[in-house]
Amino acid sequence: MSRGLGDVYKRQVFGFINIPKGLLYDIVRHPLLQRLNRIKQVGLSSVVYPGAQHTRFQHSLGAFYLMSEAITQLASKGNFIFDSEAEAVQAAILLHDIGHGPFSHVLEDTIVKGVSHEEISLMLMERMNREMNGQLSLAIQIFKDEYPKRFLHQLVSGQLDMDRLDYLRRDSFYTGVSEGNIGSARIIKMLDVADDHLVVESKGIYSIENFLTARRLMYWQVYLHKTSVAYERMLISALLRAKELASKGVELFASPALKFFLYNHIDPEVFYNNPDCLENFIQLDDNDIWTALKVWSTHTDKVLSTLSLGMINRNIFKVE
């Protein structure tokens, strides 16, 4: 696909990332993707690793870059990929995280219970597809694993997808945990297709072993670090307390979007059938949560204020 240069992003980890004009450029500039600039990739891990300030937008661009490299590599090995398929799978990886909210897994445990970010991503992709007159139809097919060339879906969501290859290396870079610094270029070079499924050449087995080890170590040292987990539990407790107070009619400061979820019972059926849920969800980002916590830290309810002040001042529950 040679449509001219639409935009160039200078990013850590992979350097310059070129976004061609057309559909992919329109996706990157779309407010739903730009919203990811205001959502940190690793949530509350910055309490342990202060350098981990990178965003889901940066991750989406990095995954897009790796997808472009993977498509080029697979095509060079004789695997025929139409330009339309290449563009669609690039669109799918750009959009794979748009359903994340602030501190995504915290929200799934508190104010948006029972609705996963993957389901919300699909809802938002379908919404964008209507806006773009069906240009994302093929990307959605690939995302849902409904396209005959199954390896394209596996590049988006699989055991060796571009999502994992980017976030492990990116999170390793920003946290300084070197064990997660995988050789993504080497792994991509070893990819091939057999019977429409993604496979790895035998000489790439060592790289895959390193990848699996790196993933385990990153979960151990970063994603499930006891301090991060304790901080997350405090946030869950604060939001649940706020929701309890809201159910009793107590007036709480919150942005309109956050207030919608605090003062309404949202289960999967309501979320899927009430358009206001999605409209309010896409207005949420990290700023809504931190601003609310800052104000709640002086609330007259001692439980809410103690939890909120602890979040603001990093006075964290101790995990023994």
Q: What residues fall within each predicted segment?
A:
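Histidine-centered, transition-metal-coordinating active-site segments
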Residues: 3-88, 102-108, 112-320
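Short alpha-helical catalytic segment bearing the HExxH-like zincin motif
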Residues: 89-94
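Short active-site segment of divalent metal-dependent hydrolases/proteases
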Residues: 95, 99-100
